[in-house]
């Protein structure tokens, strides 16, 4: 996701006096103000953690990261385990739990699914506001007895995905997973809410070809790209094959076989 466009006016807001110190800390870290005239978004700090709220009469509800309850918990318990398409795409199999870099982490949903299945995950989210939501969600989840051991496998990195991949230090990830923002329209309520919120902040990933090139250069075993089902492949080398679902597909770029 692209860095925050300057046109968006964002303030940090404490949802109660007791959260003012934390709000000040987030404002300082992110270079945001506590008071902004005609703000379009509020990064709110309250008892449920950090959340991003679009302002205005037609704004959807707040977006926050919650790995303990809600959709993440339901998918963890009932989501299909290693039979899920994303698991097959990254190469999860009997005795195989690859080390995965999710270079477009967003709110961490796909990374959490893979961590639940036992994969060691590195995550990069280059949009600072979304990265802050993810950092806060991981910190809260770490305190939960059931979910804590799962998020302990999720390691959040800060910075630009392409630069971090090009300058990677140490053992490379076996699999790199990409889900670039694509200018498409879907009708589910969840997509509406999150995409309506994020699109003004992050735009589309116009550097997706460079993202793919950096991933192919770094990954030791394969690169997986999630796309809307009918969207074209990312410009560049073509995938060897794909897995297709109802609304999305996974383009797979293998380099060598994953073995137990």
UniProtKB/Swiss-Prot annotation:
Keywords: Cytoplasm, Methyltransferase, rRNA processing, S-adenosyl-L-methionine, Transferase
GO CC annotation terms, alphabetical: cytoplasm
Listed InterPro entries: 16SrRNA_methylTrfase_J (IPR007536), SAM-dependent_MTases_sf (IPR029063)
Gene Ontology terms for molecular function: rRNA (guanine-N2-)-methyltransferase activity
Translocase found in the keyword field: no
Keyword Protein biosynthesis part of the UniProt annotation: no
Residues bound to S-adenosyl-L-methionine: 125-126, 179
Reaction catalysis annotation: guanosine(1516) in 16S rRNA + S-adenosyl-L-methionine = N(2)-methylguanosine(1516) in 16S rRNA + S-adenosyl-L-homocysteine + H(+)
Assigned EC number: 2.1.1.242
Coiled-coil positions: none
Pfam families: SAM_MT
Function: Specifically methylates the guanosine in position 1516 of 16S rRNA.
Entry similarity comment: Belongs to the methyltransferase superfamily. RsmJ family.
PANTHER family in the record: RIBOSOMAL RNA SMALL SUBUNIT METHYLTRANSFERASE J
Protein name from the UniProt record: Ribosomal RNA small subunit methyltransferase J
Organism: Pseudomonas fluorescens (strain ATCC BAA-477 / NRRL B-23932 / Pf-5)
């Amino acid at each position: 996701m692209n860095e925050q466009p300057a046109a968006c006016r964002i303030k940090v807001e404490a949802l109660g006096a007791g959260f003012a110190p934390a709000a000040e800390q987030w404002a300082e870290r992110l270079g945001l103000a506590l008071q902004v005239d005609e703000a379009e978004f509020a990064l709110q700090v309250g008892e449920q953690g950090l959340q991003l709220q679009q302002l205005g009469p037609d704004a959807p509800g707040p977006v926050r990261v919650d790995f303990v309850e809600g959709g993440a918990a339901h998918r963890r318990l009932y989501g299909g385990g290693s039979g899920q398409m994303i698991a097959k795409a990254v190469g999860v199999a009997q005795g195989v739990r690859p080390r995965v870099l999710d270079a477009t982490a967003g709110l961490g949903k796909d990374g959490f699914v893979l961590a639940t299945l036992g994969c060691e995950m590195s995550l990069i989210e280059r949009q600072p506001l979304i990265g802050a939501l993810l950092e806060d969600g991981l910190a809260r989840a770490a305190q939960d007895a059931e979910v804590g051991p799962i998020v302990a496998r999720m390691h959040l990195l800060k910075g630009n995905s392409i630069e971090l991949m090009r300058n990677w230090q140490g053992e490379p990830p076996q699999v790199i997973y990409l889900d670039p923002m694509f200018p498409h329209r879907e009708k589910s309520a969840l997509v509406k809410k999150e995409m309506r919120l994020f699109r003004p902040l992050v735009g589309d990933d116009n550097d997706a070809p460079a993202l793919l090139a950096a991933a192919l250069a770094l990954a030791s075993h394969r690169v997986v790209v999630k796309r809307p089902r009918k969207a074209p492949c990312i410009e560049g080398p073509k995938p060897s094959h794909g897995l297709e679902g109802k609304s999305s597909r996974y383009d797979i770029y293998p380099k060598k076989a994953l073995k137990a």
